[in-house]
């Protein structure tokens, strides 16, 4: 700004004005007290306004000293709103201008703006004249001309516009503009301004245009608060451009101004922001703003009308438009002028509006600008006068008088007319003030009246209430009189008179006394009635209402200015309108009048008396009304629906996200994603027998993963190759910690599958030991399943079974008999079981108690201990592991839970330690699941006949890696072949808690699994104990022999009678009798009996187990528990019974292998043997197994494509009578609401225990897997990675979608282990499953992990490239191929048939030995399956690294669904596989369920 600084007083506020082109200085005047006019002249040059403008103004950053005048409105009024000040506008230029128009004093400076001054002045005068003349018309055209003139002087142009509100202001503005101290300044200013404006207020570029108000205001404001100039006014911003500034405060832009009259000027008025309406007018944009404001305040109407409408629109657009131009143009006077004109136009309206303003003329307050100019005019009347100082002279003219305008026009000369100095607060302030005062007084008066009225009303109400009360009293008497009692009384009286005994109805003993009393009361009432009438008078109290005094105040309230107000004013303190006082009086009178009303009321009262009484009588009825409230209850109903059902359906997916949450719901589990993993396991479930293998628990390390194992997938494959299942579980095994899961022991039921015993071959595998760590999802993250597994050492024999897990389906495989040794495998169980068993086992144990148990005996796991292979755990994949035939281990029911006898051992649970089973790693070969054959499939269950033969599926190889299937272990869903034990489950009771209640059992199982002893079993099936012996005969607590027939009957009846769960089961079963028979046969089967009978003997604890069973073997209870367990496990019906050793799945492949080898399930493990310790097959082993584990396992096994996940289900081996396992259980499972199963499975998976397995750490992977839709074709497609990805993608999507999949899909990372493994398996499964995507789906379709792979894979294969599996079935396991085999196997068993997904899948046929499930190095290494799997995948590429991220894309995964087309999978029937099928079935159940959901 120029160095020159001036201080002037405007409105009593001191304005410091700096002149000079420099923008730095602002002149602000604060208006005092809000003269409304800011007077601020921010003169600083426009510069001030410029950028600094905003700052300055407000802060008065540079010289701008803006005091806010009291008038808060403007506070800065932004410089008087218009002050134009244009600050920007050159206010600097105008030296006085600062406010340029805003303050009259400045105005003169403004007028005298430097070079333009002369021109400005004349222009100003001209403008004023025009404005005034135009004002009426409201046409701003003239203003436009004026603006042009003003524009000539830049400031003029802008300012004027700004002034718009008051005509004067515009000129002022011009003056101000002129004021620009020099042309140069001006120019500079202009430029500067422009820039500044643009900068500051870019919105309106006006620099000068800004009408000061606007701009100014804006600037002002800007300075003030907004950054825009407007800011100061901020509201004022409203200034026109304030709009831009919008002054933030206010709402409309202009309006916003503080109402501030919008615009700066309005600002002044601003005070009255009230005019908010005006605001708009204020909007009027600077011009008139001031006026507007005032007007506004007063009226706002006027303003509104003209200013608001015109100005706003013109101003808004034009101003902005023009203003910008102005800024630009200002330098160019001519164009600028044009713009100015526009502004002027606006101004005119402002003027009009000003006129509108009430008393004030637009000029006076309305035009603050004018006003300021007028300020010279001291009185409001003077308001009309405007001051303008063209050359520093002020002109003041009454706004109203055109003459004044003319004056202004002419001379602008000096002195303001009516010259209260513009700075004189009275100029605008007084008026403004008076208005405020008047308004306040009026308000007070009104408030007084209001309060008076309120008081009056209150009084009346009180009187009324009193009257009512009296009436009520009277009525009560009257009523009584008239009412029954009295009437009766009368009657009585009459009777009495007649000699009739008084009626007893009347309460009073002495009727007469009553009557008298009534009478007296009535009399009193009458009296009261009169009183009541008197009371009515009290109504008079209304007088209080007078509050006359307030009324007086109110009068003052009327703004003195307005004549009326004035009157009141006098009356009020404002002596002025003393006369008005009379009116004030009237006001009170009015009140009295009202009071009078009450009086009348009084009169009516008396009459009312009688009537009222009657009415009173009527009143009573009212009461009834209340009852209505009851309705409320309705809402409660809603809870009923409670989602329970829902969860199941979506559950799978939903669970995903909710993983944990979902868990609660099983359905919610929706995330099944994790479940998905389990699902895999599920498939494994079939492998359940394999479960025994699980004992290898050592692999447990993967435990965590194990759960992930998802054996679910395997499960299907389980059919394929029970071993596979086991393997996976193996992985789970690692979770050793899982061991704690002890509960899973429950899986025991799976036990029956244990039969596979033959597998023994894996024996070697035992080594995994280390992993013992199996983490059990169960509570402890890592259960060191390892623990005992060691002992299982003997695993040797079982060895092969190793992984069979998956074989699950093979379940029946013949009696692995030898498998008993597998005992060790139990460990695996822990993982899976742990997780699954925990829940399943508890139930199952309680129900089946030991269901898995029997498998327990897996025979001395001996070898199974297999060292802790822990790491091996993952092997779980063993997946294919031939038909574990012996679901024995069936721990499988649980996902992981290797079916290992552990289940029943459950209690043996103490073994809890699954810990080590890890080593079980090798599921050995699940070999012949043999047992599984039994599949409870429901009617289909053909008992599978002991697939026995399948047993040796031969190397089936643990491929079992499928481990994942683990879950399937028990076929929790029921779909799953329940894998293993399920069948036996029933009686397993003896094992351990057996007798206990489900929860107890669950506890036992958990404890057992967790305990070292059990862990051994679970892990290694430890079972060295070999079949506990109890197996032989189950004895009930009462000492009776266990009657299998009874058990079968009960189970059947329970199943059939139990809710829908089983209905479907029943339906699926051709006939209940068939199922029953099958079940009975299964139960009686040696393998199964072992399960049922006791915990697999080996379980050591079994003894206790036996006790448990012996506690009291209530067949009904047992059955119930068994089923409940299965159901809770997600198996629809555990019935399937043996189905499947597959159970594994909880165990890592190694565990399974070891377990199976050691257990009677060795056969089950069977072929898996080759799978060798599929090693960590990773996931499959148990849900615990992570994808990576699975991946590793798979790779080791050769399923590179599926990367461990599936773990090679291991060729189901010749599951032997597939019929039994796969179909029966599967069917049954299918029947049993796959959804339910899925939900349960999901829930289970979601449960913390399981989740730890499954999810394990979500696994870093976050599977990138989703990589792409690939899932669709990729599905299993060639590589695990693709599969995995696909699955991840789809799954993730799917599940992920699900969220899916919850942890699984979504996190893949989270789910990662489980998710991952699930993912891959799921992926395939998912693909096939499609939406199901989640574990459940995978399980749903395959049931076991394997199954999953199987169906899925097969599906995939068929759908997508069949790719490796089929090609290299013998060689590396191609999951696709494997899936196909498994699917075929399952189908052959009839298992898949139920699955929607694979309708046609031919039985996967033995998956073919998956080849050693390949231990998941990772899995085995740690319990963290997820991590392992992820690592594995990453390492091998199977998992695309964390594809997880990508995973999202996975949605394509759903494409996978098409996979189901897989039917082709039918492949020749792997008939034998069926055994595995058992396992598979269990898994199936779960998986399938999922699948169906998915589907």
Curated annotation (Swiss-Prot):
Residues 1486-1495 have a biased composition (Basic residues). The keyword Cytoplasm does not apply. Residues 786-807, 871-886, 901-910, 946-955, 981-993, 1167-1179, 1208-1218, 1257-1269, 1403-1413 have a biased composition (Pro residues). Residues 1296-1308 have a biased composition (Gly residues). The intracellular/endo domain is disulfide-linked. Prolines at the third position of the tripeptide repeating unit (G-X-Y) are hydroxylated in some or all of the chains. Residues 1483-1495 are annotated as: Nonhelical region (NC1). Residues 1-535 are annotated as: Nonhelical region (NC16). This is Collagen alpha-1(XVII) chain. It comes from Gallus gallus (Chicken). The gene is COL17A1.
């Amino acid at each position: 700004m120029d160095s020159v600084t001036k201080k002037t007083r405007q409105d009593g506020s001191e304005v410091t004005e700096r002149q000079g082109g420099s923008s730095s200085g602002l002149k602000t005047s604060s208006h005092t007290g809000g003269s409304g006019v800011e007077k601020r002249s921010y003169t600083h040059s426009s510069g001030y306004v410029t950028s600094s403008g905003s700052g300055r103004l407000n802060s008065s950053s540079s010289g701008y000293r803006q005091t806010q005048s009291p008038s808060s409105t403007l506070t800065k009024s932004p410089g008087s709103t218009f002050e134009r000040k244009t600050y920007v506008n050159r206010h600097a230029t105008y030296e006085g201008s600062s406010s340029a128009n805003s303050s009259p004093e400045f105005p003169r400076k403004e007028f005298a703006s430097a070079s333009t001054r002369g021109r400005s002045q004349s222009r100003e005068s001209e403008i004023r004249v025009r404005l005034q003349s135009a004002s009426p018309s409201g046409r701003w055209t003239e203003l436009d001309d004026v603006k042009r003139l003003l524009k000539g002087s830049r400031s003029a142009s802008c300012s004027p516009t700004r002034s718009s509100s008051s005509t004067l202001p515009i000129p002022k503005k011009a003056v101000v503009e002129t004021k620009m101290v020099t042309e140069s300044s001006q120019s500079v200013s202009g430029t500067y301004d422009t820039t500044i404006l643009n900068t500051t207020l870019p919105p309106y570029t006006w620099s000068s245009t800004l009408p000061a108000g606007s701009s100014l205001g804006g600037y002002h404001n800007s300075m003030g608060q907004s950054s825009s100039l407007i800011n100061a006014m901020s509201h004022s911003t409203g200034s026109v451009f304030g709009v831009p500034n919008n002054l933030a405060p206010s709402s409309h832009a202009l309006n916003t101004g503080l109402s501030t009259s919008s615009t700066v000027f309005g600002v002044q008025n601003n005070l009255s922001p009230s005019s908010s309406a005006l605001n708009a007018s204020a909007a009027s944009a600077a011009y008139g703003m001031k006026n507007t404001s005032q007007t506004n305040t007063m009226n706002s109407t006027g303003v509104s009308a003209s200013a608001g409408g015109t100005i706003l629109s013109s101003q808004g657009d034009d101003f902005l438009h023009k203003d910008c131009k102005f800024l630009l143009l200002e330098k160019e006077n001519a164009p600028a002028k044009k713009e100015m004109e526009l502004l002027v136009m606006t101004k005119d309206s402002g003027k009009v509006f000003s006129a509108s303003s009430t008393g004030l003329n637009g000029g006076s307050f309305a035009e603050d600008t004018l006003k300021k100019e007028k300020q010279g005019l001291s009185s409001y009347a003077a308001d009309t006068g405007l001051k303008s100082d063209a050359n520093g002279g002020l002109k003041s003219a009454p706004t109203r008088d055109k003459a004044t305008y003319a004056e202004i026009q002419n001379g602008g000369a000096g002195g303001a007319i009516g010259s209260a100095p513009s700075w004189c607060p009275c100029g605008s302030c007084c008026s403004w003030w008076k208005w405020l005062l008047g308004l306040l007084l009026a308000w007070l008066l009104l408030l007084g009246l209001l309060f008076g009225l309120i008081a009056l009303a209150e009084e009346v109400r009180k009187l009324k209430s009193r009257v009512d009360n009296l009436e009520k009293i009277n009525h009560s008497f009257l009523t009584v009189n008239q009412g029954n009692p009295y009437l009766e009384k009368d009657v009585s009286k009459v009777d009495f008179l007649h000699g009739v005994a008084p009626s007893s109805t009347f309460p009073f003993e002495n009727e007469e006394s009553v009557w008298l009393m009534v009478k007296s009361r009535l009399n009193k009432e009458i009296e009261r009635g009169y009183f009541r009438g008197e009371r009515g008078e009290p109504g008079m109290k209304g007088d209080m209402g007078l509050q006359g005094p307030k009324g007086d105040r109110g009068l003052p309230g009327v703004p003195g200015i307005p004549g009326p107000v004035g009157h009141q004013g006098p009356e009020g303190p404002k002596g002025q309108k003393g006369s008005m006082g009379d009116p004030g009086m009237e006001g009170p009178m009015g009140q009295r009048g009202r009071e009078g009303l009450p009086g009348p009321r009084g009169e009516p009262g008396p009459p009312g008396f009688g009537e009222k009484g009657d009415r009173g009588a009527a009143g009573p009825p009212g009461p009834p009304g209340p009852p209505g409230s009851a309705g409320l209850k309705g809402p409660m109903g809603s809870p009923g629906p409670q989602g329970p059902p829902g969860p199941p359906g979506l559950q799978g997916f939903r669970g995903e996200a909710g993983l944990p949450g979902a868990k609660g719901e099983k359905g919610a589990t929706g995330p099944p994603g994790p479940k998905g993993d389990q699902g895999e396991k599920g498939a494994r479930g079939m492998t359940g027998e394999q479960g025994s293998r699980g004992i290898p628990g050592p692999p447990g390390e993967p435990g965590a993963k194990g759960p992930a194992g998802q054996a679910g997938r395997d499960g299907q494959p389980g059919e394929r190759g029970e071993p596979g299942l086991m393997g996976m579980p193996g992985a789970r095994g690692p979770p050793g910690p899982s061991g704690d899961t002890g509960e899973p022991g429950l899986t025991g039921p799976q036990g029956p599958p244990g039969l596979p015993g033959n597998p023994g071959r894996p024996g070697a595998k035992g080594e995994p030991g280390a992993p013992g760590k199996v983490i059990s999802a169960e509570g402890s993250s890592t259960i060191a399943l390892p623990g005992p597994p060691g002992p299982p050492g003997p695993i040797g024999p079982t060895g092969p079974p190793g992984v069979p897990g998956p074989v699950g389906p093979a379940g029946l495989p013949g009696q692995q008999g030898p498998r008993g040794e597998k005992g060790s495998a139990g460990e695996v169980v822990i993982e899976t079981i742990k997780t699954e068993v925990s829940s399943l086992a508890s139930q199952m144990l309680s129900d089946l108690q030991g269901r898995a148990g029997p498998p327990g005996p897996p025979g001395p796991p001996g070898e199974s201990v297999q060292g802790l292979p822990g790491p091996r755990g993952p092997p779980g994949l063993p997946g294919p592991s031939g038909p574990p035939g012996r679901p024995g281990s069936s721990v499988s029911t649980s996902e992981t839970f290797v079916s290992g006898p552990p289940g029943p051992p459950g209690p043996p649970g103490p073994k809890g330690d699954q810990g080590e089973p890890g080593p079980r790693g090798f599921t050995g070969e699940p070999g012949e699941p043999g047992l599984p054959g039994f599949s409870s499939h429901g009617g289909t269950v053909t008992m599978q006949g002991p697939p026995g033969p399948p047993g040796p599926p031969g190397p089936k190889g643990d491929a079992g890696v499928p481990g994942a299937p683990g879950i399937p272990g028990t076929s929790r869903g029921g779909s799953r072949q329940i894998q293993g034990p399920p069948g036996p489950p029933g009686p397993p009771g003896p094992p351990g808690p057996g007798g206990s209640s489900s929860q107890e059992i669950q506890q036992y199982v958990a404890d057992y699994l967790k305990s070292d002893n059990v862990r051994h079993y679970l892990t290694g099936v430890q079972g060295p104990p070999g079949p506990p012996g109890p197996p032989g005969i189950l004895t009930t607590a009462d000492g009776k022999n266990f009657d299998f027939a009874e058990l079968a009957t009960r189970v059947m009846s329970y199943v059939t009678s139990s809710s829908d769960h089983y209905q479907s089961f029943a339906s699926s079963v051709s006939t209940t009798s068939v199922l029953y028979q099958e079940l009975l046969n299964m139960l009686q089967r040696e393998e199964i009996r072992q399960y049922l009978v006791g915990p697999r003997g080996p379980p050591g604890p079994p003894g206790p187990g036996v006790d448990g069973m012996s506690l009291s073997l209530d067949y009904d209870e047992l059955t119930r528990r068994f089923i409940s367990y299965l159901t809770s496990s997600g198996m629809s019906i555990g019935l399937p019974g043996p189905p499947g050793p597959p159970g594994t799945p909880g165990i890592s492949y190694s565990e399974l292998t070891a377990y199976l080898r050691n257990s009677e399930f060795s056969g089950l493990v069977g072929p898996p043997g080759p799978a060798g310790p599929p090693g960590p097959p990773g996931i499959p082993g148990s849900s615990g197994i992570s994808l990576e584990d699975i991946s590793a396992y798979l790779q080791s096994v050769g399923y590179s494509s599926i990367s461990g996940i599936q773990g090679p289900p291991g060729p189901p081996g010749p599951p032997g009578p597939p019929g039994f396992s796969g179909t029966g259980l599967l069917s049954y499972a299918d029947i049993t609401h796959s959804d339910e199963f899925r939900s349960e499975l999901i829930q289970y998976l979601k449960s913390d225990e399981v989740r730890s397995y499954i999810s394990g750490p979500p696994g870093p992977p976050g599977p990138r897997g989703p990589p792409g839709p690939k899932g669709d074709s990729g599905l299993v497609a060639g590589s695990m990675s693709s599969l995995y990805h696909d699955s991840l993608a789809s799954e993730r999507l799917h599940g992920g979608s699900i969220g899916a999949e919850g942890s699984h899909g979504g996190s893949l990372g989270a789910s990662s282990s489980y998710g991952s493994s699930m993912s891959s398996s799921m992926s395939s499964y998912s693909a096939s499953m499609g939406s199901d995507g989640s574990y459940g789906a995978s399980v749903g379709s395959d049931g076991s992990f394997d199954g999953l792979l199987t169906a899925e894979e097969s599906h995939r294969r068929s759908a997508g490239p069949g790719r490796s599996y089929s090609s290299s079935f013998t060689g590396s396991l191609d999951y696709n191929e494997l899936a196909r085999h498994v699917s075929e196997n399952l189908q052959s068993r009839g298992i898949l048939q139920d699955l929607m997904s694979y309708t046609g899948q031919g039985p996967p046929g033995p998956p073919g030995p998956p080849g050693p499930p390949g231990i998941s190095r990772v899995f085995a290494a740690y319990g963290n399956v997820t991590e392992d799997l992820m690592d594995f995948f990453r390492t091998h590429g199977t998992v695309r690294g964390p594809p997880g991220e990508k995973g999202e894309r996975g949605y394509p995964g759903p494409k996978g669904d098409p996979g189901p087309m897989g039917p082709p999978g039918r492949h020749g029937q792997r008939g034998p596989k069926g055994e595995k099928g058992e396992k598979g079935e269990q898994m199936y159940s779960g998986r399938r369920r999922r699948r169906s959901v998915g589907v």
